[in-house]
């Protein structure tokens, strides 16, 4: 895969102005067609083995459907990680031994991650096929949720809860008010995290009220 131009330009700006690039890559393993290239991979391709000013964050919450595990890691510029480790030592909460053992098992296994991707492909295909004519569904390139444009996000979320017992999150709750308005307003986050059979039931209920 060729190196994307955007991170190369961003790294050049980081060198010029000395700012840190913190890349949230917790969704990086939930792709559909081709795996994305990560920030540290870009650094390596550029010959930047010190990963200067670059750090990445990974988590089990998305790749393994384990948001409650609170297990993840940060990697990158050692000069940044040293003070971060000290901060984490004094301000972070240690995982129990049981959680650490479960985390090791999850990090060492890729089979369930591949199955996870397969399941999300099937769920998105289900929604596109069954609801594409009823809702403005735009399939993302990766991830597990739709960012759906609606007339009023709070009213739409309330309608789905009252009429179909389906919970979605109003987009305005994910952002803040600015002088230009709320960027999440009139969008809803529709996450396909339930299993395929439950998603089929969701589709059935949505078709009944839309």
Task: Give the label of every model feature segment.
Residues 1-210:
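PLP-dependent class I/II
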